[in-house]
Amino acid sequence: MKSINAYTDGSCLGNPGPGGWAVLLRYKNNEKELVGGELDTTNNRMELMAAIMALERLSEPCQIKLHTDSQYVRQGITEWMSGWVRRGWKTAAGDPVKNRDLWERLCAATQRHMVEWCWVKAHNGDSDNERVDVLARGQAMAQRSTVASR
C-alpha cells in the first residue's frame, strides 16, 4: 500500500462568496497539485472539498496522512460524525448538520484508504500548508474575477 502525504486547504472571500480549494499530494519524490473553486460557497465547504478531492483522486487504496488546518474537518470526521449518523444527521443540539452532502461524500471517500488526520496550525511556517493556502486563495480570487466579469 502506497504511503501518501496530502496537504489541503480551502478559502472563501466573503463567506459566503467565491471560494477555492487546493490539494498537494506527495508520493516519494512525486507531487501533484489539484485546485478548484465555486462561485458561491463557504470556507467550510471549500475545506471539505479539498479533503474530498485529495482522497477521491487516488486511484488505488493508500495509507494517507492528510494535513489540514481546519479543525472543522479534522474534528468532524474523527469526533463528531459518528454522533451525527447515530442521531440521523442531527447535531447534539438537534439541528440538521450543515454541509451534510459533503460530509457524506468525505465519509465515503475515506472507506478505501487508511487515513491519518493531521491538524497543522495555519500561517505558522509549514511550507506545504502555506503552498496550498496560496493556491486555494488564488482559486477563490479567480472565482471572484468570474463573478465581476458577468
Curated annotation (Swiss-Prot):
Residues at which Mg(2+) 1 binds: D9, E47, D69
Subcellular location: Cytoplasm
Keyword Ribosomal protein attributed: no
Cofactor(s) annotated in UniProt: Mg(2+)
InterPro entries documented for this protein: RNase_H, RNaseH-like_sf, RNaseH_domain, RNaseH_sf, RNaseHI
Residues reported in the UniProt entry to bind Mg(2+) 2: D9, D133
Co-factor binding comment: Binds 1 Mg(2+) ion per subunit. May bind a second metal ion at a regulatory site, or after substrate binding.
GO molecular function annotations of the record: magnesium ion binding; nucleic acid binding; RNA-DNA hybrid ribonuclease activity
Keywords for this protein: Cytoplasm, Endonuclease, Hydrolase, Magnesium, Metal-binding, Nuclease
This protein's GO CC annotations: cytoplasm
Pfam families: RNase_H
GO biological process terms on file: DNA replication, removal of RNA primer
Function according to Swiss-Prot or TrEMBL: Endonuclease that specifically degrades the RNA of RNA-DNA hybrids.
Subunit and partners: Monomer.
Family statement: Belongs to the RNase H family.
NCBIfam families according to UniProt: PRK00203.1
PANTHER family (alphabetical): RIBONUCLEASE H1
The protein's name: Ribonuclease HI
GN (gene name): rnhA
